[in-house]
Amino acid sequence: MKKPLCIFMYVVLCAATQVHAEPYPLGSMSCDDIGAFASQAMQWREDGVKYKEAKTRLDALRPDESVEKKNMRVVMQLVFGNYGDSWTVESAGSTMKTDCESGR
């Protein structure tokens, strides 16, 4: 008789607990920092820097394998990908900052 009661309590507890996802960890970077880097990467793109060279520049900025560097790689992939086709230096920064602030 105790086993069904335990199962019932477990189900009630699970149903009452809210499930939510945490935003992607930023490490020591703020959303302003993410936006500033997006603008910097977009400037590189507008200056004709190829993606491979931009990765080399990122390695010089952040030689360690950190959460910050992973985030910066994601930003660079967006900037040098299809999204970057319609961005300016300013809009890249503001878009990435807004996305960061909304937890994306």
Language-model features, listed with the residues they occupy:
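Cleavable N-terminal signal peptides
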Residues: 8-9, 19
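N-terminal signal peptide c-region/cleavage motif recognized by signal peptidases
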Residues: 14-18
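Bacterial N-terminal signal peptides that target proteins for export
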Residues: 1-8
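Compact alpha-helical subdomains of small soluble proteins
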Residues: 45, 49-104
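Hydrophobic alpha-helical segments
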Residues: 32, 40-41
